[in-house]
Amino acid sequence: MKNSSSMLKGVKSFIGSGIYTNKPIYDVAIVGGGIVGLATGRELLKRNPKLKIVILEKENEIAPHQSSHNSGVIHCGIYYKPGSLRAKLCTKGSKLMYDYCNENQINYENCGKLIVATKKEEFQQLEQLYKRGIENGVPNIKLLESKEQLLSIEPFINGGLRAIHTPSTGIIDYKEVSKSFGNDITEKFGKDSKSEIKLNFNAKNFKYNSNDKLLLISTGDDDDDEEQQQSILTKYSIVCGGMNSDRIAKVAYGNDEPSIVPFRGSFLQFKPEFRHLIKGNVYPLPNASFPFLGVHFTKRINGEVWLGPNAVLSFDREGYKFTDFNLHDTIDLIKNPGLFKLAKKHWKYGLGELYRDFNKDHFIQLLKPYMPNITVDMLEYGGSGVRSQAISKSGDLIEDFIFDTPSDVPIIHVRNSPSPAATSSLAIAIEIVDLAQNNFKNLNSL
């Protein structure tokens, strides 16, 4: 961790400074208006509606990136290592998400999921995954030991031999959930305290004054004219920076590791006349070497059926097309020692994913074991998303949630929030606010 004590030296008092005299002072500033940041703001206000909260989002809308560019699945928690935060928060978060949607009239569908074995050699792995699901408390999970049982749920997955059925898996539009969380902050829980969401606020600079016990967050760099910047003062801050969590940590008293590597995932989709071929979600058995769930069939809440995604290294953290390129993001990739170690181990896998990105026929070869009659003519290009993957300097992919809490500054950094973060968002928020109440002196008395 950086020596935050030395970083605090030389920061002038904010109180009485002409530039900041009229600035509102917030109790908590949450950096990042994605689903995790919004859920965290909601949870803070739910516990204490007197808090004055601000959400700082750099784009012109909330939940613009990972929170809305995803497959829209409410995951059940089967995949994750028992005892891990991912397992605990997904199982808990799934129930909380369904309860929240019922209370707030948000549309979802409990369509279920099959995890399918297509050859006998996969039966042992399927049984092990089933046992993991039991251990993680996945509700109503069932091992389907015959093809007939499988076909009774997904009649066109005639390449499958056995499967796990998780009826608690669902589909939803997380953008709508995020909007509802935002309304909870500004209206339901935070109206009296005048809590708010500030858009187009790109938090770049963080200065903490230990005498004032205030943190200045601004949109400019140190050498920019302070009067030309947007800035706010806050007693505490929680950073839910998603794809930019590593960059924000570097300028906001956080640890240097882990770094973020972006992976773009592209989807195909069934043409409308073929959507009936899938009733819910159909997944392969996961590859133990990677945190991604493989190419799968996903029913969408709007009726579409997506196939994918692949996982291709992205040269633009917020670019959703094959041709998107950002020089800053690319330089960060080149300078990342962990990425080169990862690429050395898995370059063949990476080339295969890249080829699938622009070759439909190669893409569907991964789907034919499940649906042998699928053809390119049934498909068209669908959406895409970019996933933030935390990586260590040794090239290891970091799979669990990470919270970074500098000792001298009242900030919490959410450093890694991989899938199923959207499913788990309400449970993650509880975890973060519990941490804040333990770490932020006087928060409970505000």
UniProtKB/Swiss-Prot annotation:
Q: What are the alphabetically sorted keywords of the record? A: FAD, Flavoprotein, Mitochondrion, Oxidoreductase, Transit peptide
Return the GO cellular component terms, semicolon-separated.
mitochondrion
**Record's catalysed reaction(s):** (S)-2-hydroxyglutarate + A = 2-oxoglutarate + AH2
* Source domain of life: Eukaryota
The stretch annotated as transit peptide is: 1-28
Cofactor requirements of the protein? FAD
Q: Name one GO molecular function term.
A: 2-hydroxyglutarate dehydrogenase activity
Q: Which residues cross the membrane?
A: none
E.C. code: 1.1.99.2
Q: Name one Pfam family in it.
A: DAO
List the subcellular locations.
Answer: Mitochondrion
Keyword Cytoplasm in record: no
Name the protein family. Belongs to the L2HGDH family.
Q: Which protein, by its recorded name, is this?
A: L-2-hydroxyglutarate dehydrogenase, mitochondrial
**Lineage, opening ranks:** Eukaryota, Amoebozoa, Evosea, Eumycetozoa, Dictyostelia
